[in-house]
């Protein structure tokens, strides 16, 4: 499975999360996953909620449209984005 997969109602992303980064950003490919740096610490679900908020802004969807399918407690996650309104250029380059 590739880092970004299209499905009938959106996109499925395989992510590697770097918590406690200096800024929020989509870094690029990390092996067969997309690396995302976020500023939140990995404590009490703060990183997950910050990740859904960050992805919501990037794809212009509500936080409820972002589902963490796998990896709730780890750095390796599989996230589904339902009906994205826009696709960031870093992700669009990986779908081709």
From Swiss-Prot:
GO CC list: cytoplasm
Domain of life of the native organism: Bacteria
Pfam family, one: DUF167
Gene3D superfamilies xrefs: YggU-like
NCBIfam families linked: DUF167 family protein, PRK05090.1
Family statement drawn from the similarity comment of this UniProt entry: Belongs to the UPF0235 family.
Protein name: UPF0235 protein YggU
Gene encoding the protein: yggU
């Amino acid at each position: 499975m590739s880092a970004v997969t299209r499905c009938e109602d959106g996109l499925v992303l395989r992510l590697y999360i770097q918590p406690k980064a200096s800024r929020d950003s989509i870094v690029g490919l990390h092996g067969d996953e997309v690396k995302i740096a976020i500023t939140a610490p990995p404590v009490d679900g703060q990183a997950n909620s910050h990740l859904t908020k960050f992805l919501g802004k990037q794809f212009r969807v509500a936080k409820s449209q972002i589902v963490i399918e796998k990896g709730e407690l780890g750095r390796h996650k599989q996230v589904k984005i339902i009906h994205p309104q826009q696709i960031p250029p870093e992700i669009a380059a990986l779908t081709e």
